[in-house]
Amino acid sequence: MFDKFGEFDSYEEINRAAKAQLEEEGLEAIKTIAEENGLDPEDAEDFCTGAIEELTTPSLAAMGKLELEAKDLSLTGALRDWTDFIEQLCLEDEKMALAVRRKGKSLKDCMALILKNAFNDKAQLDDRITKAAGLTPPLYISIPGKAQIKEIVREYYLGEKK
């Protein structure tokens, strides 16, 4: 994912690298920085032409990282929904966006915590539901709600514990 320029710790680092590369290498280097960080290639062009002063913002940098990680993990279904929810949290809270961008924080580890919590909270479904689904009882399930996911995400990325 971060092959040429490495993983950046913040949107500021991305912007500093982009400014340095603009002076040295030009558009192709900026496009590589954008690609490695999940940023829009058009933003790279706009940055190079001076249409925008910075390549990225806190929320765009966080969402770009999440998108790259989700693609790398081939997330679909509920896990993709959870990723979208984390992106929404980044748009609502700059502190969250900054935390998601930090080195060492990963969507993989956050998803693992959500799944672990879900597994630990599993409950047996009523046998009538299980049978109506054509399955054999007993069946245990746990699907965390948004409030629970938000709590886990905030704890993982921000260190906040309720």
Summary of predicted features, one role per range:
Residues 1-89, 158-162:
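Low-complexity, interaction-prone regions
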Residues 22-26, 93, 106, 145:
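Helix N-terminus capping/helix-initiation residues
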